[in-house]
UniProtKB/Swiss-Prot annotation:
GO molecular function list: deoxyribonuclease IV (phage-T4-induced) activity; DNA binding; DNA-(apurinic or apyrimidinic site) endonuclease activity; phosphoric diester hydrolase activity; zinc ion binding
SMART domains: AP2Ec
Cofactor(s) required, per the database record: Zn(2+)
Family per record: Belongs to the AP endonuclease 2 family.
Annotated cofactor note: Binds 3 Zn(2+) ions.
Name of one Pfam family that matches: AP_endonuc_2
Catalysed reactions, as listed in the record: Endonucleolytic cleavage to 5'-phosphooligonucleotide end-products
E.C. number: 3.1.21.2
Function summary: Endonuclease IV plays a role in DNA repair. It cleaves phosphodiester bonds at apurinic or apyrimidinic (AP) sites, generating a 3'-hydroxyl group and a 5'-terminal sugar phosphate.
InterPro entries found in the cross-reference section: AP_endonuc_2, AP_endonuc_F2_Zn_BS, Xyl_isomerase-like_sf, Xyl_isomerase-like_TIM-brl
Residues noted as binding Zn(2+) 2 in the record, renumbered to the chain: E144, D178, H215, E260
Species this chain originates from: Thermosipho africanus (strain TCF52B)
Protein name: Probable endonuclease 4
Entry keyword Cell membrane: no
Amino acid sequence: MIRIGAHMPIGGGFKRVPKETYEIGGNAFQIFPHNPRQWKANLPKEEDIKLFKEGIKKYKIDPEAMLCHSGYLINIASPNIETWNKSLELLILEMKICSTLGIKYLNIHPGSHLKSGVENGINQILKALNTAMEKEKNTFILLENVTKKGGNIGSTLEELKLIIDKAKFPDRLGITIDTCHAFDAGYDITNKEKLNEFLNKIDKYFSLEKLKFIHLNDSKNDLGSNKDRHENIGKGKIGSEGLKVFISHPLIQKIPWVLETPGDNDVHKKDIQEVLKILEVK
């Protein structure tokens, strides 16, 4: 069975997420654990947790297809000690929120080294991950591939490998592949041969077991542009034919897909329908 969904709003509480996921035709989802544009976050209220978990059972959502996405302000690669400390503190709280909700996976962007260099940035990332994962043992952290702009770390599989290889708790680390980010970073996932090379490299560096989620997005920009601008399914430079190559691969079909395309739930419902149409799923 294809597991597909979208990034869902949490306004009004986490309790709304399972039902709204079902209403857009999904059986997987991603959420923010708090307002992503604020440093402040709170643990969910007991009633919200209870109703959320009841909804998960009612709508038969696979626990392996539920994902939290870290807030925008976190930068655990930062050379600025104040920013790094605040990022670490919020990351630990996000892991607690995930655990409270019964969500196993937290997706994070590795962060930007802010001109301090990749090596220094990776060292900062490792310090943060090791500390956070020592304190919170129930949450798996997934490193998302990103585009190279702004000193971002993780635009290549090699950089993600460096982090996981040196981490203290590699068994609780995995990766998320964002199709827009991969395409914009120069990985041609629209070509069968190149896609196989990409997946073989993932298997060689991490094992495919580490690939836990796909962020399924089209791209507004060309291959290798390093822009990171998501587009709705079939309307971008990856396009319907390119996405068909990617999502038709049997290995990709084993992994949950979450859309982060522009628009609200109604738009995401149409995007999910478009994905299934591309796959020729009735």
